[in-house]
Amino acid sequence: MLEKVYVALIHYPIKGKDGSIISTAVTNLDVHDIARTARTYNLKGYYIVTNLRAQQDMVSKMLKFWREGFGSRYNPSRAESLKLVKLKSYLEDVLEDIESVEGERPLIFFTSAKKRENDISFEEGRRIIIETEKPVLILLGTGWGLPDEILEISDYVLEPIRAQSDFNHLSVRAAAAIIIDRLIGENYARRD
């Protein structure tokens, strides 16, 4: 059901270069660009997940400027896309928020640049999203990817965007746009 698709950009817990669990920094571009993609594809919400108070404060100030301040008058379409953004400390908070809105836990789609056992194709993911009545949450990682603890609670693992490439290091903004397009594409426009 395309009306219940959400995306979350995870900054904690994230794998560090050495495999340890870290928090990554939120970037202005990730907030803006993924929000614009989410709005373009009519997603129901976009979550920024960071456990760092300073990062939360920075994102909150930025959102206030673009939603309510001068930015909302200067660039109304940006303000519209940023209305989709919710800031949460942990993935559990995101799941609780979606469950409070939708009445049930979402199906979780795990994404990775790495090929994993039992991953599903984008075509299969698209079919699941269209056919399910449940809400869907697409998880995007930062740093060196989402950790196993998130993999373990996920319902599906999507195939990598370019599994066979000798260079597979897209920005999360580019990956988000490609993943969302492959899963939703023009299906949303054609449902009427």
Swiss-Prot record:
Gene3D superfamilies associated with the record: 3.40.1280.10
Pfam families to which the protein is assigned, alphabetical: Methyltrn_RNA_4 (PF09936)
InterPro entries (alphabetical): Alpha/beta_knot_MTases, RNA_MeTrfase_C_dom, tRNA_m1G_MTases_N
Similarity field: To A.aeolicus AQ_054.
Name under which the protein is recorded: Uncharacterized protein TM_1570
Organism: Thermotoga maritima (strain ATCC 43589 / DSM 3109 / JCM 10099 / NBRC 100826 / MSB8)
